[in-house]
């Protein structure tokens, strides 16, 4: 796991993902997330869950949460409705989780729990949550087989009436139809530095694109696997592990929050061993 942690830290050093609360960009992200969740809480499934748990603290887990922007925004929307919240933020990046603790204290006035763990192994912990959240640029980190394991693990730690919220974006439509796949893409360009992502291959058996993230002028680089998920593909996997799935568009019809309710109780340990096809995967 140490190698994975080191790789993620390297990715987020090169990739310009804003996490500093003093930045206007991060404050804007936080405000936007709060508005999304405040509106989402009017969904009938969430109303039912909140009514059921109104006299008890809601256990909320923000998965792959980084600095906790999504989880903190959701917790604030819940607390503003008068609900008690216990927030857990999960990630592998220790530096990001330190920020999550500070930001939660500053914004929510509460101490939160942080969990340094591979999200595929959440079921190995003694957690029983009411609400789980995947927010931000998260799903592209997981290939289809990992996504199955991830959702199985999350469903396992939720209560029988628990709900999983997943922010998703139709990247098939946006990237391959609207924009066009780029061999070389400037992810960030400023006076001080440039961050490029460069096509380095495709694995047809895992469905991931290989891209090198390159920082200029330091020339630090890292090879990443990227899966371009769409709304329907993610929703179908959610449906495998939850009894019903809905979608609430946010900015556009191709971006929003997937809502999955009532876990089916499928044991994630059934997916411990990857299928033979993955072992034989190859790059083109």
Feature map (PLM): residue ranges:
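Class I SAM-dependent methyltransferase SAM/SAH-binding core
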Residues: 71-121
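A short glycine-rich, Lys/Arg-flanked "PGG" loop and its adjoining helix->strand segment in the class I
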Residues: 148-160
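SAM-dependent methyltransferase
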Residues: 167-235
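C-terminal lobe and adjacent flexible extensions of AdoMet/dcAdoMet transferase-like proteins
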Residues: 241-284
């Amino acid at each position: 796991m140490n190698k994975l942690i080191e790789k993620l830290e390297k990715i987020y050093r090169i990739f310009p993902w804003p996490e500093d609360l003093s930045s206007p960009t991060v404050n804007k992200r936080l405000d936007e997330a709060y508005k999304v969740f405040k509106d989402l809480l009017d969904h009938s499934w969430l109303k039912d869950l909140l009514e059921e748990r109104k006299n008890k603290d809601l256990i909320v887990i923000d998965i792959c949460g980084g600095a906790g922007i999504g989880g903190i925004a959701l917790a604030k929307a819940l607390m503003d409705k008068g609900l008690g919240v216990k927030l857990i933020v999960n990630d592998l990046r220790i530096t990001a989780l330190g920020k999550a603790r500070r930001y939660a204290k500053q914004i929510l006035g509460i101490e939160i729990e942080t969990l340094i763990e591979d999200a595929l192994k959440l079921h190995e912990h003694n957690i029983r949550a009411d609400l789980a959240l995947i927010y931000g640029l998260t799903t592209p980190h997981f290939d289809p087989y990992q996504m199955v394991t991830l959702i199985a693990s999350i469903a396992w730690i939720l209560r029988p009436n628990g709900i999983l919220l997943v922010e998703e974006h139709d990247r098939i439509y946006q990237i391959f139809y609207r924009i066009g796949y780029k061999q070389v893409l400037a992810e960030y360009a400023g006076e001080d530095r440039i961050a490029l992502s460069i096509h380095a291959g495709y694995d047809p058996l895992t469905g991931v694109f290989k891209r090198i993230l390159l920082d200029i002028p330091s020339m630090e680089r890292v090879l990443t696997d990227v899966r371009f998920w769409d709304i329907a593909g993610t929703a179908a996997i959610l449906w495998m592990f939850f009894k019903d799935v809905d979608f609430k568009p946010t900015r556009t019809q191709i971006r929003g929050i997937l809502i999955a309710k009532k876990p089916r109780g499928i044991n994630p340990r059934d997916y411990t061993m990857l299928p033979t096809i993955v072992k034989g995967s190859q790059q083109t």
